[in-house]
């Protein structure tokens, strides 16, 4: 948000102009593309680790100043965590048949729709933590992959949806998505066999099964010519990306190419991940940091109280936020399933979890009151923008050790 950029630039200017200085150093970082793919923040991880090593820095706190929304004029909101985001991508492979004989094949759309109906808004894929609940999952895309019309059933179909999470791990979410998807296919296949029986059709098509993207890759790796295929596939993905193809489309295309290379004609569904991935993060759950989030909450509440304001602490910012890339709640190995399941080459979408773990800086969102965010009438409260928030940030810089030191 432009207000956040201007507000923090003003704080930087005022702090830098004071020759006496405060108790901590201030690094201003301006990055673009938040709420889409966070290219700026992901790209800045290398800079942050380089500066850390060059100047022996200890990052103690990161502050984003995105506006908050509230119906209470005397209330300020502090977010001490941010929701995580996964984007599962589902590619279904059917068995071709003529449209006039649908029970001699399996329509990939039938498989995809069965899974989509099962997963959409499923409560098992929401999450709860610290009294807050993440939104239910919702599909963004669902369609066949035919390039033109013909009279055959659909061989490939694909879709993707968003899963917003708080404490559940990517592995837990992937496992539950896998289980629910297989349940959906089992239910579909029972109905399908019953229809075949009614039509006097033989049961010659195998029961559809769900596999993970990682399993698909492992099966393909065992085949002759895989390395050459993989190199060509990655090059095509890079070229398509430069030509404007979305990450989600790249992931779908990559899975379809792997299925074609595998050559298994049985019906199946592949589940992987498409970018972007945002780890969930809450300052209460961070290890290996020198910062006490409770001290900040207390300090900010006391500051606001002297000005006649109340403080509302929200454990998670429920919109996508760059603070996801400031620290990890768990060890890097806990997130490996994401990297293994991303159906896009690292040259196209890079996420360096090791660097996030290296900077490991607690992050909060502390910004001005705003209204109609992301709309034409978007605006922020002038007093917050010019006085309340910047004045507190400056006080924090000058008295950080006195107020928030954990030693």
Can you say where each PLM-predicted feature lies in the sequence?
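Short glycine/serine- and small hydrophobic-enriched flexible loop segments
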Residues: 9-17, 114-121, 394-398
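Hydrophobic residues positioned within well-ordered beta-strands of beta-sheet architectures
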Residues: 26-28, 88, 157-159, 269, ...
